Amino acid sequence: MKHLINIADHSAEEILGLMDEADRFREALEGREVKKLPTLRGRTVFTLFYENSTRTRSSFETAGKWMSADVINLSASTSSVKKGESLKDTGLTLASIGADAIIMRHPSSGAAQQLAGWVAPEGQGPSVINAGDGSHQHPTQALLDAVTMRQRLHLGADRSAAGTGFEGLKVTIVGDCLHSRVVRSNVDLLSTLGAEVTLVAPPTLLPFGVDTWPVRVSHDFDAEVPEADVVMMLRVQAERMNGGFFPSHREYASLYGLSKDRAAAMKKDAIIMHPGPMVRGMEINYAVADYDNTAVLQQVNNGVHVRMATLFTLLTNGENAGI
């Protein structure tokens, strides 16, 4: 595996391999006072973010540093991009400096794929990890979500060679599916592993061509809540809208927000997830966000281990015994 750009490019075996690797890193670090492994000593990792980020950027930086890599953070606002430098020239500059990996977030769908073609033609050059490209993909978010589901719901504890543990799992994703890269990566990953995915959103917030996706579509949140093993709430991405997608925030919250009543209607063992950032009082009730069956902070924690697994796999081909 050279790059991680699009979940759809990877098999169930590769996906489960990354998830298993994340579990191994979590176990290796558990109980350590000093969270430091020599796994990527001497490797140079650049983060290149053209959009704001808290969880993704900080967890990638933490992942690299916990494996002893040299992590260098770049922001478009403080780099030569501000002077008009193109993505291609920025990428080639980092490759020439000696980058082993470039972790990039970019507002344009497909930007990560373009970057990989420029900096690693014919597979020679730094690995590119897509930390979010427009409304297209966010592969490590889908991986950490799947790891969290597996932990909380004890999926695949006795997994056979032929199974994934996700077969028949019912995942309901609610909210702004139109602008969400998270929903696309999760649909690709979960359908590959055999889960059943339902999207719940107003018609104006569903992606074009969603009828060709391996999902069910519903506009009735109340009807779907009791059936779900996982309810994943999505933020309304107002920064990508010009208005007119729904009448008001109050009406949206009434129809598509996870209220106390809807949370009470969930299965006893069902869990609540959110990729963040959460807007309490909009897509999720203030109190519900802190319920015991809400896995948001566990998702964040798993993000570090998933990103460790990703860097480890791409930069060592999984052959370094440094864990």
Swiss-Prot record:
First-level EC class: transferase
GO MF annotation, one: aspartate carbamoyltransferase activity
Pfam families xrefs: OTCace, OTCace_N
Listed GO biological process terms: 'de novo' pyrimidine nucleobase biosynthetic process; 'de novo' UMP biosynthetic process; amino acid metabolic process
Pathway of action: Pyrimidine metabolism; UMP biosynthesis via de novo pathway; (S)-dihydroorotate from bicarbonate: step 2/3
Sites where the protein binds carbamoyl phosphate: R55, T56, R105, H138, Q141, G276, P277
Coiled coil: none
Gene3D superfamilies: Aspartate/ornithine carbamoyltransferase
Catalytic reaction list: carbamoyl phosphate + L-aspartate = N-carbamoyl-L-aspartate + phosphate + H(+)
Binding site for L-aspartate: K83, R181, R235
Keyword Transferase in annotation: yes
Cellular component per GO, a single term: cytosol
SUPFAM superfamilies hit by this protein: Aspartate/ornithine carbamoyltransferase
Keyword Transferase: yes
The protein's Enzyme Commission number: 2.1.3.2
Swiss-Prot/TrEMBL keywords: Pyrimidine biosynthesis, Transferase
Family that this chain belongs to: Belongs to the aspartate/ornithine carbamoyltransferase superfamily. ATCase family.
Subunit structure: Heterododecamer (2C3:3R2) of six catalytic PyrB chains organized as two trimers (C3), and six regulatory PyrI chains organized as three dimers (R2).
NCBIfam families: asp_carb_tr, PRK00856.1
Physiological role: Catalyzes the condensation of carbamoyl phosphate and aspartate to form carbamoyl aspartate and inorganic phosphate, the committed step in the de novo pyrimidine nucleotide biosynthesis pathway.
UniProt protein name: Aspartate carbamoyltransferase catalytic subunit
Organism for this UniProt entry: Corynebacterium aurimucosum (strain ATCC 700975 / DSM 44827 / CIP 107346 / CN-1) (Corynebacterium nigricans)
Top-level taxonomy: Bacteria, Bacillati, Actinomycetota, Actinomycetes, Mycobacteriales
Gene: pyrB
